[in-house]
From Swiss-Prot:
Binds 1 FMN per subunit. Belongs to the azoreductase type 1 family. This is FMN-dependent NADH:quinone oxidoreductase 1. Keywords: Flavoprotein, FMN, NAD, Oxidoreductase. It catalyses: 2 a quinone + NADH + H(+) = 2 a 1,4-benzosemiquinone + NAD(+); N,N-dimethyl-1,4-phenylenediamine + anthranilate + 2 NAD(+) = 2-(4-dimethylaminophenyl)diazenylbenzoate + 2 NADH + 2 H(+). GO terms for molecular function: electron transfer activity; FMN binding; oxidoreductase activity, acting on NAD(P)H as acceptor; oxidoreductase activity, acting on NAD(P)H, quinone or similar compound as acceptor. The keyword Membrane does not apply. It holds the Pfam family Flavodoxin_2. It comes from Pseudomonas fluorescens (strain Pf0-1).
């Protein structure tokens, strides 16, 4: 049975375009997979703590099996989020682009799930760090909305897009390399122009729902 983990990063709730597009995909996908499990994790309207000193000390404790109870508590949410990632086959991330990057809640989620010894490993080869991803066989779909035009591949503003390219990098680092991005652009442009972009994104998501 397929299991999909949906990460919603917009703080706007029902007014969010990226969230609505992602839910359009989910609805179509569930029609084709009625027995599948869908888990929604809210990171835009719920607080995901930023990494702090206590988290770093606990995450890099030299003997993970012997962590004190206080350190285990510092990593409890992170352990839960990592467990969710391993427990699902498919990852769906809906996010707007804010100031050229992702919202802080999504950044915090990524920081919580990129964990040494859990989602990636680290060794030294002649003193040079070598990294090994520990997630395998998973796919991801990123659904994003952008205020302007031209932030996609080949676009005039592509170099300013540090949102979905950064997500690709972070996901690839832990082993999720099969990543598809669907974007709606132009919310700050004319209403009709944005509507066309949204319609195109919706159609692509409906097509993906048949194959994802």
């Amino acid at each position: 049975m397929s299991k999909i983990l949906a990460i919603h990063a917009s703080p706007r709730g029902e007014r969010s375009h990226s969230r609505r597009l992602a839910e359009t995909f989910l609805s179509a996908w569930q029609v084709r997979h009625p027995q599948a499990q869908v888990t929604r994790r809210e990171v835009g309207r719920a607080l995901i703590p930023a990494v702090n000193e206590a988290f770093v000390a606990a995450a890099f404790y030299p003997e993970p099996e012997a962590r004190p109870l206080t350190m285990q508590a510092d990593l409890a949410l992170s352990d839960q989020l990592v467990g969710e990632l391993f427990d699902h086959d498919l990852l769906l991330i809906s996010t707007p682009m804010y100031n050229f990057n992702v919202p802080s809640g999504l950044k915090a989620w990524v920081d919580q799930i990129v964990r040494l010894g859990l989602t990636f490993d680290h060794t030294l080869d002649n003193g040079i760090a070598q990294y090994t991803p520990l997630l395998h066989g998973k796919k991801a779909l990123i659904v994003t909305s952008r205020g302007g035009f031209g932030f996609g591949p080949g676009g005039e503003l592509e170099a300013l897009n540090h949102a979905d390219p950064w997500l690709r990098t972070a996901l690839g680092f832990i082993g999720i390399n099969d990543v598809t991005v669907v974007a709606a652009e132009g919310e700050e442009s004319a209403e009709r122009t944005f509507a066309v972009s949204v319609a195109e994104a919706e159609q692509r998501l409906l097509d993906l729902a048949r194959a994802f």
